[in-house]
Swiss-Prot record:
This is Probable glycine dehydrogenase (decarboxylating) subunit 1. Belongs to the GcvP family. N-terminal subunit subfamily. The gene is gcvPA. The glycine cleavage system is composed of four proteins: P, T, L and H. In this organism, the P 'protein' is a heterodimer of two subunits. PANTHER family: GLYCINE CLEAVAGE SYSTEM P-PROTEIN (PTHR42806), GLYCINE DEHYDROGENASE (DECARBOXYLATING) (PTHR42806:SF1). The glycine cleavage system catalyzes the degradation of glycine. The P protein binds the alpha-amino group of glycine through its pyridoxal phosphate cofactor; CO(2) is released and the remaining methylamine moiety is then transferred to the lipoamide cofactor of the H protein.
Length: 455
């Protein structure tokens, strides 16, 4: 029985309209040998038999053990999280424009804001952004609006910022008259050389962007850079992995006065890895800048009868109130991801988050230490890291990654495209999901690959 409602004449008309000769041509990017003409299912089998057959076939698929990080991380997601998120009240609900329309949804966002403000040490949080990269771009725009003392629209950025974040930042700000200066990183420790900051002392900056842990996994000298920025009248934008804040000091404690705005990618907290997302960005700030913060903000209030309720607050910033000057941007997808993150943080609690972060660091430390024992392999930088580290290899890193795939391991992120000096370097990441057996298999596979191709 065909479940396609179109007649042959209708299909032909549609194909003629788009200039295709057949339906198969629409799928020509899939190699012919990979296409299945039939599912090869026997006639007359029942649902149980069909399910068992499909399960048996699915079990033939093999998933490599993943040691890639670079901004998106494999963490364990308790089954309860997406079981709750998938409930219709959350899963099919639309982003609330009227506070009274969805008190439960608003409370979830309020709880998210409370937890993110606590995690980052800031006074206020919004309801999320599209992803970490756009959260940074919006943070830069926010800082420029907020810093009335700055005479320019220049922003100083440490070179070890995630390259994708930088590209998104440049794209969003391209026609807004904003200029960027880059501080080169120290090749010995993989982070910004604070002594080089004085080279920029005579330039007026509206903001300084610090990522820690940075793209190369290293912990930046956040105190020195923060104090320098404030001394020269710039606001400090912290870009960070929220999971790291469970064991590292919060951006509110950076330097003498703390960062002014904090942003980053929220994916590590309950959101599964996916090509293209949806993920969500987070943004928190000091109260002095809250009226320039983009995105929705949920507040707690009381109604006429004195009953506690939740509402969208500071709505004059939003698109449905002042479209021409709106700072708001969020969509329903991000609201759903925020729900997952809220449940994730609630289930794990402060102790659970700390345990996840600690085990992730310990596993990465173990992996790096064991790799460095292999002849010709070494840890690239001599400074502290969180859950990913750059490893130098005696062979081309891209070749190494390809060969490790044959051993069932996604070995890490090839850095040659990021920097020409790192053609023989990969960035490896371990989290709480990696077992001692996984790490042992990585080490043995590395020895095998290097022996096979002459490393």
């Amino acid at each position: 029985m065909s479940f396609i409602p179109h007649k042959l004449e209708q299909i032909k008309k549609m194909l003629d309209t788009i200039g295709a000769s057949s339906v198969d041509q629409l799928f020509d990017e899939i190699p012919r040998h990979l296409r299945a003409d039939t599912l090869k299912i026997k006639d007359g089998i029942n649902e149980i038999q069909l399910a068992n057959l499909m399960r048996k076939r699915a079990n033939k698929n093999h998933h490599n053990t993943n040691f890639i990080g670079a901004g998106a991380y494999s963490h364990h997601i308790p089954a309860a999280i997406w079981d709750i998120v998938a409930r219709g009240e959350f899963y099919t609900a639309y982003t609330p424009y009227q506070a009274e329309a969805s008190q439960g949804g608003l409370q979830v966002i309020y709880e998210f804001q409370t937890m993110m403000a606590g995690l980052t040490g800031m006074d206020a949080s919004n309801a999320s952004m599209y992803d970490g990269a756009t959260a940074l771009a919006e943070s830069v725009l926010m800082a420029i609006r907020s810093n009335k003392k700055a005479k320019s629209q220049k922003v100083l950025i440490a070179e070890a910022l995630h390259p994708t974040y930088l590209r998104v930042l440049e794209t969003i700000t391209k026609h807004q008259g904003i200029e960027f200066d880059i501080i080169n990183l120290d090749s010995k420790n993989g982070k910004t050389d604070v002594t080089k900051l004085e080279d920029f002392a005579n330039t007026d900056y509206a903001a300084v962007v610090i990522q820690s842990p940075n793209f190369l996994g290293q912990l930046a000298d956040v105190d020195g850079i923060t104090n320098w920025a404030h001394k020269h009248g710039a606001l400090v934008i912290a870009v960070t992995n929220p999971m790291s804040l469970a064991i590292l000091k919060s951006p509110a404690e950076w330097g003498d006065n703390g960062a002014d705005i904090v942003c980053g990618e929220g994916q590590p907290m309950g959101v599964p890895l996916a090509s293209g997302g949806p993920y969500f960005g987070f943004m928190t700030c000091k109260m002095a800048h809250v009226r320039q913060m983009p995105g929705r903000i949920v507040g707690r209030t009381v109604d006429l009868d004195g009953n506690e309720g939740f509402c969208l607050t500071l709505q004059a910033r939003e698109q449905h109130i002042r479209r021409a000057k709106a700072t708001s941007n969020i969509c329903t997808n991000q609201g759903l991801m925020v729900t997952a993150a809220t449940i994730y943080m609630s289930l794990l609690g402060a102790e659970g988050l700390e345990r996840v972060a600690s085990i992730s660091h310990e596993n990465t430390q173990t992996l790096a230490t064991e790799l460095a024992k292999i002849n010709g392999v070494s840890i690239r930088f001599n400074s502290a890291f969180f859950n990913e580290v750059v490893i130098d290899l005696p062979i081309n890193a891209e070749t190494f990654v390809t060969e490790m795939e044959k051993e069932g391991i996604d070995a890490g992120y090839f850095l040659g495209e990021y920097h020409s000096d790192l053609a023989n370097s990969i960035m490896v990441c371990a989290t709480e999901i990696h077992t001692s057996e996984d790490i042992k298999e990585y080490i043995e596979a590395t020895k095998k690959v290097l022996a096979r191709i002459g490393g």
